[in-house]
Amino acid sequence: MAALNFEPLFPLIRDNQSFVITSHVNPDGDALGSEIGFAEWLRSIGKKVRVINHSPTPYNYEFLEKPNPVVEQFDAAIHPDVIYAADVVFVLDVNDAERVRSLGRYLSRGAAVPKGEPIPDPTTKPIIVIDHHLNPKEFAKEYFIDTDATSTGELIVRLIRQAQPTLGGTISQQAAQALYVAIMTDTGSFKFPRTDSGTFRMCADLLDLGADPVRTYDEVFNTSPPGRLLLLRECLNSLEYHFDSRMAFQVIMQSQLATAGAAEEDVDGFVQMPFQVRGIVLSVFLLELKEGWKLSTRSKGDVSAAAFAQTFGGNGHFNAAGARVHVKHDFTEMKRQILANAAQVLADADLRAQAAKDAVIAAP
């Protein structure tokens, strides 16, 4: 684990009293775990903290808010004043104000505002981004980004450990549980490439502080509503292999969500399933939204999921990325674009692999 230096943040935390923490739309375990863990530590050093998200907390992460409720869903009648009044705003696990959705317009003039609604003035207070994704957008005062980190949760643990000798504070049982969830989920239960011995040492420390790995797994993965498995059946029925079975493609439509009695959040993890098949190096999952489409992509080795997502205006990590397409193309056109862009991403990976082989052969 590289040593990102958080010391420049210490005076900002020490000298201010009120903080807002937020993250991306449809928050995952890393976003929520990082927010809750960080908020709990800030409160332990006497700070006032509000955690405000655009989206509600998904059902399988609600246990993180016990015993103390933490996360508020954005309310336009209340929260703009909270944001303006805060001394500092922390944006975790995302580096684009657009992806903060409702709160984004209060952080950057570049964030979209729904048609017909007034454009508010962004806060003049410091905005701090802590994240591990590629290609940050300019809107914050300072960025603390480590794209080699397993998760934003890992970065929050490092921040707290660096700050404790100066600022004090404790990692409570609730904070430890939340930060463990952040790391566990964003490493794919410790199977993604950046997982190393330091990851396990950090998680061992969190277990010593009260994180419960058995309960965590059960709450995160074994609390699905009945509709999720019905939706999974539809997803697997849509499965197609392309490019000599190197790429897998799956899709779920709005009509299938309705029939299954499922929600959009119930598709979480579907994109990962094709990697159970030998030879798959790129998986693309397409979800029809009420207005547009959502793409999730995962890859293995030298195949860039990020490059694929960027062809649709998205972003992410090299091997895990996503995008939203706000234009409602019909399915046939979306699939055509997906396959064309996937072909290019696979071809680029093949060229990189061949260049690496040629370099080895040419080496003295």
Q: Positions of the model-derived regions?
A:
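Short acidic, glycine/serine/threonine-rich loops at helix termini
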Residues: 33, 62-65, 102-103, 139-142, ...
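Hydrophobic/aromatic beta-strand patches that form the interior of the parallel beta-sheet core
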Residues: 52, 90, 126-130, 142-145, ...
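Short glycine/serine/threonine-rich phosphate/pyrophosphate-binding segments
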Residues: 29-35, 97-101
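Glycine-rich, phosphate-binding/catalytic loops in enzymes
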Residues: 37-39, 106-109, 145-146, 201
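Active-site cofactor/cluster-binding pocket
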Residues: 71-141
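Short alpha-helices
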Residues: 125, 130-203
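Hydrophobic helix-and-loop "lid/oligomerization" segment in the mid-to-C-terminal part
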Residues: 2-25, 33-65, 69, 73, ...
